[in-house]
Amino acid sequence: MGTEIYGSIEFRHPGVGTDYYEGEPWVAAMDLWPLYDQSDYAAFGLLFGVRNYAGFQPLAAGRGLPNDLSGAVRAQLESSVARGDMDGATWVTWAQLAGLDPAFLPGRYVGRVSWSQPESGLSHGQLVPARWPDDVLATTGPPPPGWDPAHGPLDWTADNGLRCRYEPMRTDVLLGPGTGWPHVFAVMKALADRFGDDAVRLVVAFD
């Protein structure tokens, strides 16, 4: 069974510390779903250190749930995390996400190669270093001429008919168009434009 992500976007209420505001400091703005509904372990590893097979230095791993969690997100996550039904609980601010280097690559692997049979659509994949392992080369053949491990994605058809795809493990690919993360980031940025980069955060846990 695969690992899935759950969570919500919160913002810090601008009235905290004033005489007129008596509510909780952090307010739930929007659930992670329907903005993000995928299970990309490379992205999970990059951001949160979960299923980090690529060996990223994660941005925000193992922080736990914030002590000042909003009531709505507390009801969503706290009991499941406490029972052990979810783990990897952590949080990250928009300021930290906005500071990610889009061209960053992990040290061990530079990309991932996937392949599928046209008739079945069933896909297989493997993380690869700059020099592809022999078993990958035997399946997909060599990468096309002019291949650059830092660029892509790249699609080709192998001599055996397999449809192949290479994706670099760059931040802008793992979190870019088609991944679902741009929707999350768009909401967080809109909130940050109003409340400040450090006053918007994403709180998550995994099952």
Question: What positions do the PLM features span?
Answer:
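Acidic (Asp/Glu-rich) sequence patches and key acidic residues
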Residues: 1-197, 207
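Conserved GNAT acetyl-CoA-binding A-motif
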Residues: 199-202
